[in-house]
Amino acid sequence: MIFLRIEHTIPSGLLENRRVRVLVVGAGGTGSAVVMGLPYLDQAMRAWGHRGGLDVSVMDADVVTETNCIRQPFSISDIGLNKATVLINRINMFWGTQWKAFPIHLDKRVQTRGNESSPDIVIGCVDTRAARVAIESAVRTTFNMTMYWLDVGNNAASGQYVLGQPLNARNHRKAERLRTVSELYPETLREQRHPPPVPADSECVAGWHSGKSQPPRLTSFSRALPR
């Protein structure tokens, strides 16, 4: 096996006295966890002397459903509201930020609008082939000044987080460029994810509402990890 050592340097644009633009695509289980942690990173950056901090936008067209209230940070009062809007409103009220929510999908129609400047960092928290393809297309074309694409994903038995530099107007082809998820794991763009080997949220809700059985125990979902 051949190992390639790469020395990577953070682009100077992220160290300037301006806000670092971050776009999070997906506000579900993974996306909501990522978004709720970004205010702490923003505070840490400012504490260490970065004058701009983060300017975060969240994009997701889905609304909160009853099943989302089991494994995602939403409550019954959020049902019917847009996920991205709920999360951003909550963060802005608590932290005093002015972050933005876009209750839309990242598709070709959005990419051709051209009314938003390229984010410095795109964080993909999606679980479908179509969504990853849309992100890859965006960071190569419309968002052609994006520095990094961080992909966070999982399937039934594994997961990954990959920080890459998409080939675009800012990132050119060179040996030290960080490869993206589409280059390292092309199957994530070619194949659909398999459902996790645990009962779906809807099944849990149905069982609780039927009154025929006790709520499922979490221990029944556990799996031994390989050594």
What are these regions (language model features)?
Residues 55, 98-100, 148:
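Conserved beta-strand segments of alpha/beta enzyme cores
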Residues 122-125, 151:
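Redox-cofactor binding/interface segments in oxidoreductases and associated redox assembly factors
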Residues 2-30, 34, 129-227:
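Glycine-rich phosphate/adenylate-binding loop
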Residues 80-119, 126-133:
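A structured beta-alpha segment of the ubiquitous adenosine-cofactor-binding alpha/beta core
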Residues 18-49, 57-65:
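Glycine-rich adenosine-cofactor-binding loop
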Residues 19, 53, 119:
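Phosphate-coordination loops involved in phosphoryl transfer and adenosine-cofactor binding
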Residues 52-96:
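Glycine-rich phosphate-binding loop and adjoining beta1-alpha1-beta2 segment
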Residues 41, 74-75, 139-142:
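Glycine-rich, phosphate-binding/catalytic loops in enzymes
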